């Protein structure tokens, strides 16, 4: 059964957002991966703070970005498209994490789907 795997907080001003979440929730942040990307410690699950980006052309991400873990990304992608969803960002590999895609649902919400794989290259 697919389950929530990760959430990301998108921010225009990373230092300001970091201070807010440190003060509000006591979370700590560790630089990881590309510049401007921080893993959040203390959020209770995989979580990150990252610079705001466009997954759908011309529309910056607002709010929290959720990613669902699935056993087979290709099958899930086909099911999402058959249900009326659209690919927002094609499949990419995150080394040591897995294969990731982003989709737009029928209501315009953008979300990620990942097939976790610690051996991904």
Regions flagged by a language model, labelled:
Residues 23-29, 84-87:
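Conserved acetyl-CoA-binding loop of GNAT-fold acetyltransferases
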Residues 4-12, 55-81, 83-121:
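Vicinal oxygen chelate
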Residues 1-19, 45-46, 64-68, 116-121:
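N-terminal beta-strand motif that seeds the catalytic metal site of vicinal oxygen chelate
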Residues 27-61, 110-116:
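Conserved short beta-strand elements that form part of the metal-binding/catalytic scaffold
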Residues 17-21, 80, 108:
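Conserved active-site tyrosine of GNAT-family acetyltransferases
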Residues 23, 37, 65, 100-101, ...:
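Residue-level detection of beta-strand scaffold positions
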């Amino acid at each position: 059964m697919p389950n929530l795997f990760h959430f990301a907080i998108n921010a225009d001003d990373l230092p300001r957002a970091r201070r807010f979440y440190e003060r509000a929730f006591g979370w700590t942040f560790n630089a990881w991966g590309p510049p401007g990307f921080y893993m959040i410690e203390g959020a209770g699950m995989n979580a990150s703070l990252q610079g705001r980006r466009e997954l759908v052309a011309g529309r910056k991400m607002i709010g929290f970005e959720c990613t669902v873990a699935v056993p087979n990304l290709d099958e899930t992608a086909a099911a999402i498209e058959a249900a009326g969803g659209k690919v927002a960002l094609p499949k990419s590999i995150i080394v040591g994490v897995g294969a990731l895609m982003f989709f737009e649902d029928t209501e315009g919400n953008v979300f990620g789907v990942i097939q976790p794989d610690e051996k991904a290259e």
